[in-house]
């Protein structure tokens, strides 16, 4: 678990804070949880968030990975960088596309069969995966050009059964292009609904506000790390960092949190969201008196970073902000 806190500054619109940086590291997100106080600013933010989510398109299709370079899908959605795509297969291989970058993670046999130019993710020979990152926005990758057709053939040689999930902002693509893709793709494109639930939690227990002097010698609030863990529990992550599988209660033994009781607005969204969409939603709530946003990866899917180290397993980003605490924002990364 990584944890950091930053001070929200007036000029922060010009400079990314830690939370924004971490959101941008999660290119493929499947679940967002937002908690807000009951006030007018929260209601307005929820209306804006609902509109943004309703304007997202979310599709599923199954077939060979070569479908990703189908001319209509490639030229309008992938080459322009507006589409976010993640794969699901019956093996350990993974394919994803974000902002026009194709990332492929393959086991050794699939790497050898495909002929894709990839690098090992580790110096350890056992269970090493092979990783490739290809810029599909390149001027040298065009339909019917040699490099394009070579990559398409390599993707077509990948074994297994594949499904792909595609999302993009509807306002960036004319409806005629969406209809054309649905008819021209040789496999069915199934429209998936983004699940959005919102409501009010009556008399919810709220941890005490984070209090910190932000001096060099005190990196925790006045009540110490126990209060931090209590906030983690409230944010529904079940205190993964300390809880053993045989312990049903996420609270630390004999620790009684000093919680207040109040009503809370909640918003829970399930689907597929790019990092830019998550950042857009975060900007709508960041200045409300207190707020929480939780982001979970899509089907335990994480990107491969620039150092070619493979990330796997669940990834969660939790961020809590309270204006009463010297504008401190706590951000947790759970992996």
From Swiss-Prot:
Extract one GO cellular component term from the record.
ribonuclease MRP complex
Identify the Pfam families for this entry.
Answer: Ribonuc_P_40
User: InterPro entries given for it?
Assistant: RNase_P_Rpp40
Q: Name one GO biological process term.
A: tRNA processing
- What domain of life? Eukaryota
Among PANTHER family, the record links this protein to:
RIBONUCLEASE P PROTEIN SUBUNIT P40
Name of protein: Uncharacterized protein C6C3.09
């Amino acid at each position: 678990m990584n944890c950091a806190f930053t001070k929200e500054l007036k000029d922060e619109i010009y400079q990314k804070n830690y939370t924004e940086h971490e959101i941008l590291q999660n290119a493929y997100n499947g679940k967002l949880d937002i908690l807000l106080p009951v006030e007018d600013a929260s209601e307005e933010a929820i209306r804006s968030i609902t509109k943004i989510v309703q304007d997202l398109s979310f599709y599923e299709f199954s077939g060979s990975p070569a479908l990703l370079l189908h001319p209509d899908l490639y030229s309008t959605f992938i080459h322009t960088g507006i589409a976010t795509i993640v794969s699901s297969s019956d093996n350990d291989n993974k394919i994803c596309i974000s902002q026009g970058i194709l990332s492929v993670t393959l086991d050794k046999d699939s790497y050898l069969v495909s002929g894709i130019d990839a690098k090992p993710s580790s110096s350890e020979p056992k269970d090493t995966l092979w990783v490739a990152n290809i810029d599909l926005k390149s001027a040298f990758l065009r339909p019917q050009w040699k490099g394009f057709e070579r990559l398409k053939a390599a993707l077509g040689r990948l074994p297994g059964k594949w499904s792909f999930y595609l999302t993009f902002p509807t306002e960036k693509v004319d409806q005629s292009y969406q209809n054309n893709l649905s008819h021209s793709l040789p496999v069915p494109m199934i429209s998936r609904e983004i699940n959005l639930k919102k409501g009010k939690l009556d008399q919810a227990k709220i941890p005490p506000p984070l209090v910190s002097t932000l001096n060099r010698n005190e990196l925790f609030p006045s009540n110490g790390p126990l209060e931090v863990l209590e906030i983690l529990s409230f944010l529904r992550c079940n205190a993964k960092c300390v809880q053993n599988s045989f312990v049903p209660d996420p609270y630390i033994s004999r620790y009684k949190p000093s919680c207040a009781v109040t009503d809370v607005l909640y918003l829970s969204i399930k689907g597929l969201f790019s990092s830019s969409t998550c950042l857009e939603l975060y900007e709508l709530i960041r200045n409300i008196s207190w707020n929480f946003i939780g982001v979970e990866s899509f089907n335990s899917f994480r990107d491969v970073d620039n150092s070619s180290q493979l990330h796997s397993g669940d990834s969660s980003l939790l961020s809590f902000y309270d204006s009463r605490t010297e504008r401190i924002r706590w951000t947790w990364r759970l992996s």
